[in-house]
Each structure stands twice: as structure tokens, then as C-alpha cells.
């Protein structure tokens, strides 16, 4: 199963770039992984920004991919739950699992209906932090699936 993580906007902070690179290297021991940044929209009304950003995200999704969208209104799961979800996708023959982090105003309603919604926490985090948290949880999921001693 191939993993693709999409997000809106550039990773600007050097520590974020380093953390993303570190977790990407770790994850690639278990599965092919691609990280894709799409340009954020500026100077438009919120709904128009969502629409344009989601159009850009849409172009990065392989046909037939399974989508997991990070959304504050999404389902919350613990780390073993996320690992179980990823394992189920892998074991059921999912070719492409795409995880998507939206822009500052989230996803359009139409885009939100395309995938399963996941919330990392009831708290609000910066988009930069969420990228790191998501990759860490992906890595943790693979260590759980492989019975490795990272998750206690």
C-alpha cells in the first residue's frame, strides 16, 4: 500500500522540515510514502479559498484512493485504533491511502464528503504541528502493526 500525505501551504519552519524528513524516513521502512504540498490560496473569501485549495488537493489524489481527511469534526481514535485502520486498509488490498490536511479554512463540503474524517485531538493545533503529529502517528501505527517497541 502506498501512502500519500497532502497538505495546503509550505512547511516554513526548519524544525518542522527536519521532523517531517525524519518521520518520512522512518515510515518508508514500512511503506512507500510521498509528501505533497499544494499552494495555499490568498486574498479570497473563505469559501472560495476552500474551493480552490480543494481543487488543488483533488489533482493530487490517485484514482480509486482511500481518503482519510484530518478535520476538527472528525472521529477521534487512539494510536492502536489508527494502526488497526491502516492495517485493515493494507490487508484489504487498498493500493493508495491518502491522508489530507486542509488549509486554514478546512475543506469544502463536497471534498469533506469524499473521505473518512479523522480528528487528532479536540484541541486546535497549527497546521505545521499537525503535519509532524500525523507523521509521528503513522510511524507509531507501523511499529504497532509490526510489534516493535516504540509504542508502550
UniProtKB/Swiss-Prot annotation:
E.C. numbers: 2.1.1.177
One example GO MF annotation: rRNA (pseudouridine-N3-)-methyltransferase activity
Entry binding sites for S-adenosyl-L-methionine: 70, 102, 120-125
Gene Ontology cellular-component annotations: cytoplasm
Main enzyme class: transferase
Subcellular location, record wording: Cytoplasm
Catalytic activity: pseudouridine(1915) in 23S rRNA + S-adenosyl-L-methionine = N(3)-methylpseudouridine(1915) in 23S rRNA + S-adenosyl-L-homocysteine + H(+)
Record keywords, A-Z: Cytoplasm, Methyltransferase, rRNA processing, S-adenosyl-L-methionine, Transferase
Biological function: Specifically methylates the pseudouridine at position 1915 (m3Psi1915) in 23S rRNA.
Family according to the record: Belongs to the RNA methyltransferase RlmH family.
Binding partners and assembly: Homodimer.
Official protein name in the record: Ribosomal RNA large subunit methyltransferase H
Origin species: Pelobacter propionicus (strain DSM 2379 / NBRC 103807 / OttBd1)
Organismal lineage: Bacteria, Pseudomonadati, Thermodesulfobacteriota, Desulfuromonadia, Desulfuromonadales
Amino acid at each position: 500500500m502506498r501512502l500519500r500525505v497532502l497538505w495546503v501551504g509550505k512547511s516554513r519552519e526548519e524544525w518542522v522540515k527536519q521532523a517531517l524528513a525524519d518521520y518520512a524516513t522512518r515510515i518508508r521502512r514500512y511503506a512507500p510514502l510521498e509528501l505533497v504540498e499544494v499552494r495555499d490560496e490568498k486574498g479570497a473569501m473563505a469559501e472560495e479559498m476552500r474551493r480552490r485549495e480543494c481543487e488543488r488537493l483533488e489533482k493530487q489524489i490517485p484514482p480509486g484512493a482511500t481518503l482519510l481527511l484530518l478535520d476538527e469534526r472528525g472521529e477521534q481514535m487512539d494510536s492502536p485504533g489508527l494502526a488497526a485502520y491502516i492495517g485493515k486498509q493494507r490487508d484489504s488490498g487498498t493500493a493508495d491511502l491518502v491522508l489530507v490536511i486542509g488549509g486554514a479554512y478546512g475543506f469544502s463540503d463536497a471534498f469533506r464528503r469524499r473521505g473518512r474524517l479523522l480528528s487528532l485531538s479536540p484541541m486546535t493545533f497549527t497546521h505545521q504541528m499537525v503535519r509532524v503529529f500525523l507523521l509521528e502517528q503513522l510511524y507509531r501505527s507501523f511499529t504497532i502493526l509490526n510489534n516493535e517497541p516504540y509504542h508502550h
